[in-house]
Curated annotation (Swiss-Prot):
Responsible for transport of beta-galactosides into the cell, with the concomitant import of a proton (symport system). Can transport lactose, melibiose, the synthetic disaccharide lactulose or the analog methyl-1-thio-beta,D-galactopyranoside (TMG), but not sucrose or fructose. The substrate specificity is directed toward the galactopyranosyl moiety of the substrate. Monomer. Residues 35-41, 101-104, 164-166, 250-253, 309-311, 375-377 are periplasmic. Belongs to the major facilitator superfamily. Oligosaccharide:H(+) symporter (OHS) (TC 2.A.1.5) family. GO terms for biological process: carbohydrate transport; lactose transport. This is Lactose permease.
Length: 417
């Protein structure tokens, strides 16, 4: 009953829904749009993704700084929303033509827009709503669940619309951005009675200075967290960048593969949403560290499994593993950050460790993976990436702070005894 009366839960849950609906129109089908619509090679696709990562590097630390400095003020979300209103005009009239004119110019312009709106924008949105969740007393994971549903529904719709007229997809995204603006206008995050609570969660602190930044970077546990992110999460994202092209290669035609990819993504994200609802309960019990290790194990299994896939059914099953990984990685990372660091720095740490360092590594790994796809094929490259992710997951058992799997096992044994 409490959640039914919590206005901010519904406002920001719906904000997640429409934001990730737009992101679902872009991210899963972006490689297909590049390859099938614009006829971009795998190597050039790697350059485009590297450019997106490069410009994300410029925005992510800035967004982390601003998010902690602004606290519960909505200025940054207004800018992101305004940019998303231009989603269709950008893809149709600017990005696509520029890629045909010059791949480097197109990559730079696309990198700026996509890096701002999604690669830096998505974690900034998540960090802001995580602050609101602590202030408004609702579980972040349950609000984030709406984003999974939005992504799922969009993937199914886009899978059909994309094969009819890909431009419809982009106009749908711009329309959803207008709904974001309405939700953001009516959302209230600055009620005077909550000022004390906001201060308690660090939302109203001016959180950044050179001295504070140096103090954060002197902590070994921040670097060990970054090691996990680069070795596991970054490797997985590189694997997932061109997975749509790998997936569609198992079908008789690209159109059939694209439609099935949309249906499978929808099914996976709906299951993802159901798991996201219960994830906070599980993660509160096992702890942030074990949640990250579990996510790393699932990611490694999916990547390595893809290297041995020989049929469409196998890649469908492997695709659905994504539904287990996202809740434990996303909710687990915030639980880990708020348990191991000062909560007033949560956005800065999230956007630096989980986003900035990841994008820095992806500049090099995207190009390397693109070259591997050309030289040894998708499956050979996936085996290499999977072993890398698995290796860093095992290392993180010893380097991440907090109770690990053995401590959890001992606690379970003691409870049974």
């Amino acid at each position: 009953m409490y959640y039914l009366k919590n206005t901010n839960f519904w406002m920001f849950g719906l904000f997640f829904f429409f934001y990730f609906f737009i992101m679902g129109a872009y991210f899963p089908f972006f490689p297909i749009w590049l390859h099938d619509i614009n006829h971009i090679s795998k190597s050039d696709t790697g350059i485009i993704f590297a450019a997106i990562s490069l410009f994300s590097l410029l925005f992510q630390p800035l967004f982390g700084l601003l998010s902690d400095k602004l606290g519960l003020r909505k200025y940054l979300l207004w800018i992101i929303t305004g940019m998303l209103v231009m989603f269709a005009p950008f893809f149709i009239f600017i990005f696509g033509p520029l890629l045909q004119y010059n791949i480097l110019v197109g990559s730079i312009v696309g990198g700026i827009y996509l890096g701002f709106c999604f690669n830096a924008g998505a974690p900034a949105v998540e960090a802001f709503i995580e602050k609101v969740s602590r202030r408004s007393n609702f579980e972040f994971g349950r609000a984030r669940m709406f984003g999974c549903v939005g992504w799922a529904l969009c993937a199914s719709i886009v899978g059909i619309m994309f094969t009819i007229n890909n431009q419809f997809v982009f106009w749908l995204g711009s329309g959803c951005a207008l709904i974001l603006a309405v939700l953001l206008f009516f959302a209230k995050t600055d009620a005077p009675s909550s000022a004390t609570v906001a201060n308690a969660v660090g939302a109203n602190h001016s959180a950044f200075s050179l001295k504070l930044a140096l103090e954060l970077f002197r902590q070994p546990k921040l670097w060990f967290l970054s090691l996990y992110v680069i070795g596991v999460s970054c490797t997985y994202d590189v694997f997932d960048q061109q997975f749509a092209n790998f997936f569609t290669s198992f079908f008789a035609t690209g159109e059939q593969g694209t439609r099935v990819f949309g249906y499978v993504t929808t099914m996976g994200e709906l299951l993802n949403a159901s798991i996201m609802f219960f994830a906070p309960l599980i993660i509160n019990r096992i702890g942030g560290k074990n949640a990250l290790l579990l996510a790393g194990t699932i990611m490694s299994v999916r990547i390595i499994g893809s290297s041995f896939a020989t049929s469409a059914l196998e890649v469908v099953i492997l695709k659905t593993l994504h539904m287990f990984e996202v809740p434990f990685l996303l909710v687990g990372c915030f639980k880990y950050i708020t348990s191991q660091f000062e909560v007033r720095f949560s956005a800065t740490i999230y956007l630096v460790c989980f986003c900035f360092f990841k994008q820095l590594a992806m500049i090099f790994m995207s190009v390397l993976a693109g070259n591997m796809y050309e030289s040894i094929g998708f499956q050979g490259a996936y085996l290499v990436l999977g072993l890398v992710a698995l290796g860093f997951t095992l290392i993180s058992v010893f380097t991440l702070s907090g109770p690990g799997p053995l401590s959890l096992l001992r606690r379970q044994v003691n409870e049974v005894a």
